[in-house]
Amino acid sequence: MRIMGLDVGSKTVGVAISDPLGWTAQGVETIQIDESRKQFGYDRVKELVLEYEVEKVVVGLPKNMNNTIGPRAESSKIYAEVLESRIGLPVVLWDERLTTSAAERTLIEADVSRKKRKEVIDKLAAVMILQSYLDTTN
């Protein structure tokens, strides 16, 4: 069963997909979105769900360090609810605290240029969210 992981931001959605056995996560793409124009990338996510035969979606929930829900986490919750109604599959929220920071550190340690980091950071964060989910549930 393939599972999709999403790192939802205000400008992009990082996408990762699990292998068919649900053991490892691989980055797929970064979808450009524009919240101010109500362009959220739902159609592209649905295309990827169909292409990869996804059966479940995991959306990162960026809780605050004190475990509270801030504005970004509220946006992620709404995104997950709308996505679930549009694709007709279960959508799970997953604590993603510090995944973007960890992804940034990983890319810096790998000596990836600032320009390239900007291109792949959300996809890598989606991989980290999904891999955390897979490691915990398998």
Swiss-Prot record:
InterPro entries: RNaseH-like_sf (IPR012337), YqgF (IPR005227), YqgF/RNaseH-like_dom (IPR006641), YqgF/RNaseH-like_dom_sf (IPR037027). GO terms for biological process: rRNA 5'-end processing. It holds the Pfam family RuvX. Keywords: Cytoplasm, Hydrolase, Nuclease, Ribosome biogenesis. SUPFAM superfamilies: Ribonuclease H-like. GO terms for cellular component: cytosol. Its EC number is 3.1.-.-. GO terms for molecular function: nuclease activity. It is found in: Cytoplasm. Gene3D superfamilies: YqgF/RNase H-like domain. Could be a nuclease involved in processing of the 5'-end of pre-16S rRNA. Belongs to the YqgF nuclease family. This is Putative pre-16S rRNA nuclease.
